[in-house]
C-alpha cells in the first residue's frame, strides 16, 4: 500500500503548476474503470494506481526531483479515486522485462555541447490529436527569426529550432537566400512565443483556469553560419541549412527548451518514408506572414522517387540530403515557417523524445497544393557539420 507521506508528496507536486497556479484533483477527472490513456509523451498507456507503475513511482521518490519530471508526473495524472492517485502508466513500463532488465542505450554519437535525449525534445504538453492549434507549451524549441529592415523596423519572416543554449538551426535561404531583400539584416531570434499578438501569452485550460507563460525572449544573433556549400540561386536548394549563434546563453524553461538532433545512427540514416511527423509554426516566410498563433499539422514522409517525379516537371533534381513530406491540400508547410522544423518522434526503451528530422526548405506556390509535397533539408545528413561547427 502506498504510504500516506508519498500520497501527500505527489498531491503537492500535482498542486503546483509551472505558472504558479494550483490544481487539486477532482472527481470529474476520474476514469471509473481506469482504462486506456495517452501519456504527455504521446505513448499508449493504462490508467492505474501510482504505486502499480513502478517506474513513475520510482521517479517520484527520486531526490532531488527534477522540474521536468515534476511537470511530467503532474500531467500524467488520469484520475483520483478512494484517496489514491491514478497515473497514466506507459505500456512499456508495465512489461516485466522493462522492470527487471535495464533497457539498451541508444546508439548515439554526440558533441558535449549538444543536449542528449532526456535533456531535449521533452514532451510536456497534453497533446490534442488532429488539431491545428498548438498548446501554449507545445514545441518549446521553436524560434521566430527577426530581421532589421530599413529605418530600423523589425519583423519576423522565418522560423528556426533551438538546439542548445547558444544555437538555433534554420534554413540557409533565411540567411542569404535570393528572395531576401537586400536591406534586411538577420538580427535576432524570439523564443518562448505562442501568440504574437500578446505578451505574455495565456491559455485557459480544461479547468477554466488561466495558464500563462513568461514573457517571450528576444535574443540578438551574434553570428550567422549558412552551410558553406549552399548556393542561393540553385533551383534544388541543396544544403539549405544554417546555424545561428546567439549573443548569449538562454536559460531553459517549460516554454524555452531545445529539440534533440537525430544523433542516433539509425535516425541519421533514416529517410522517413511513410512516417507521420509534425510541422509547426506561424506560417512565416521571407515574403508572407500568415498567423499570429503557432499552428501545427501532421504530414507523412514521401518516397523520394515519387517526389522527384513531381518536381522533375520544374527541372528540379533532388538529392539524398533532402526529403519530402506532405502533399495534402491546404496543409503541409503552410502551417510551418521557412527554416522551421519538421518534427519526428523517437520512442525507445530509454527515452521518448522529439527530434529535428528536417528543416523547411521549399515547396509549391501557393503552398499546400494537393500532390505536391514540401521539400525539407534532411538534418541527419548534417549532424557531422553541426557538431564540427558549434563552439562553446
From Swiss-Prot:
Domain called Clip: residue spans: 36-89
Effect of residue 127 to V: Prevents cleavage of the propeptide
Keywords: Calcium, Developmental protein, Disulfide bond, Glycoprotein, Hydrolase, Metal-binding, Protease, Secreted, Serine protease, Signal, Zymogen
Glycosylation sites: 107
EC number: 3.4.21.-
Result, substituting residue 325 to V: In EA 83I and EA 4102; results in ventralized embryos
Chain sites annotated for binding Ca(2+): 193, 195, 198, 201
Effect of residue 172 to L: In EA 111; results in temperature-sensitive defects in dorsoventral patterning
Superkingdom of this protein's organism: Eukaryota
Family matches, as SMART domains: CLIP, Tryp_SPc
Effect of residue 335 to Q: In EA QGDS; results in lateralised embryos
GO MF annotations, alphabetized: metal ion binding; serine-type endopeptidase activity
UniProt PTM: Proteolytically cleaved by snk. Activation peptide and active catalytic domain remain associated by a disulfide bond. Processed ea/easter is present in extremely low amounts in the early embryo as it is rapidly converted into a high molecular mass complex made up of ea covalently bound to the serpin Spn27A. Zymogen activation is also controlled by a negative feedback loop from Dorsal.
Effect after changing residue 131 to E: In EA 20N; results in extreme lateralized embryonic pattern where the most dorsal pattern elements (e.g. dorsal cuticles) and the most ventral pattern element (mesoderm) are absent
A Pfam family matched in the record: CLIP
Residue stretches making up the Peptidase S1 domain: 128-391
Propeptide, residue positions: 20-127
Regulation: Activated proteolytically by snk; activation requires both activation of the ndl-gd-snk protease cascade and sulfation of a vitelline membrane component by pip. Inhibited by binding of the serpin Spn27A.
Compartment annotation: Secreted
Major place of residence: secreted
Function text: Component of the extracellular signaling pathway that establishes the dorsal-ventral pathway of the embryo. A protease cascade involving ndl, gd, snk and ea results in activation of the spz Toll receptor ligand; acts downstream of ndl, gd and snk and is required for proteolytic processing of spz. Activation of ea requires both activation of the ndl-gd-snk protease cascade and sulfation of a vitelline membrane component by pip. Localized activation of the Toll receptor in the ventral region of the embryo defines cell identities along the dorsal-ventral continuum.
Subunit structure: Interacts with Spn27A; the two proteins are covalently linked leading to inhibition of ea catalytic activity. Interacts (via Peptidase domain) with snk (via N-terminal prodomain); leads to proteolytic activation of ea by snk. Sulfation of a vitelline membrane component by pip is required for proteolytic cleavage of ea by snk but not for the interaction of ea with snk.
Notes concerning its domains: The clip domain consists of 35-55 residues which are 'knitted' together usually by 3 conserved disulfide bonds forming a clip-like compact structure.
Protein name: Serine protease ea
Organism: Drosophila melanogaster
The gene coding this protein: ea
Amino acid at each position: 500500500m502506498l504510504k500516506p507521506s508519498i500520497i501527500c508528496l505527489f498531491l503537492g507536486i500535482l498542486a503546483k503548476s509551472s505558472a504558479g497556479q494550483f490544481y487539486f484533483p477532482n472527481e470529474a477527472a476520474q476514469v471509473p474503470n481506469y482504462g486506456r490513456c495517452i501519456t504527455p509523451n504521446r505513448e499508449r498507456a493504462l490508467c492505474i494506481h501510482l504505486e502499480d507503475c513502478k517506474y513513475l513511482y520510482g521517479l517520484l521518490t527520486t531526490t532531488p526531483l527534477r522540474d521536468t519530471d515534476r511537470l511530467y508526473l503532474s500531467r500524467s495524472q488520469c484520475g483520483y479515486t478512494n484517496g489514491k492517485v491514478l497515473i497514466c502508466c506507459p505500456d512499456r513500463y508495465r512489461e516485466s522485462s522493462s522492470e527487471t532488465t535495464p533497457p539498451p542505450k541508444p546508439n548515439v554519437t554526440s558533441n558535449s555541447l549538444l543536449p542528449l535525449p532526456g535533456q531535449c525534445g521533452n514532451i510536456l504538453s497534453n497533446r490534442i490529436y488532429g488539431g491545428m492549434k498548438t498548446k501554449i507549451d507545445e514545441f518549446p524549441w521553436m524560434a521566430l527569426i527577426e530581421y532589421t529592415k530599413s529605418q530600423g523596423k523589425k519583423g519576423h519572416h522565418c522560423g528556426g529550432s533551438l538546439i542548445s543554449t547558444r544555437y538555433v538551426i534554420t534554413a540557409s535561404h533565411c540567411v542569404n537566400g535570393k528572395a531576401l531583400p537586400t536591406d534586411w539584416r538577420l538580427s535576432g531570434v524570439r523564443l518562448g512565443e505562442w501568440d504574437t499578438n500578446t505578451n505574455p501569452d495565456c491559455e485557459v485550460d480544461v479547468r477554466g483556469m488561466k495558464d500563462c507563460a513568461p514573457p517571450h525572449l528576444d535574443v540578438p544573433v551574434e553570428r550567422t553560419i549558412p552551410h558553406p556549400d549552399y548556393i542561393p540561386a540553385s533551383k534544388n536548394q541543396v544544403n539549405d541549412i544554417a546555424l545561428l549563434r546567439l549573443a548569449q546563453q538562454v536559460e531553459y524553461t517549460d516554454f524555452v527548451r531545445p529539440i534533440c538532433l537525430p544523433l542516433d545512427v539509425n535516425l541519421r540514416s533514416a529517410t522517413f518514408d511513410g512516417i507521420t511527423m509534425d510541422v509547426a509554426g506561424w506560417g512565416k516566410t521571407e515574403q508572407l506572414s500568415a498567423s499570429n498563433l503557432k499552428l501545427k499539422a501532421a504530414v507523412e514522409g514521401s518516397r523520394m522517387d515519387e517526389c522527384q517525379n513531381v518536381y522533375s516537371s520544374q527541372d528540379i533534381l533532388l538529392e539524398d540530403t533532402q526529403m519530402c513530406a506532405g502533399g495534402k491540400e491546404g496543409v503541409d508547410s503552410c502551417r510551418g515557417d521557412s527554416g522551421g522544423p519538421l518534427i519526428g518522434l523517437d520512442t525507445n526503451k530509454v527515452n521518448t523524445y522529439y527530434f529535428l528530422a528536417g528543416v523547411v526548405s521549399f515547396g509549391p506556390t501557393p503552398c499546400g497544393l494537393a500532390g505536391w509535397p514540401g521539400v525539407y533539408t534532411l538534418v541527419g545528413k548534417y549532424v557531422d557539420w553541426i557538431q564540427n561547427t558549434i563552439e562553446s
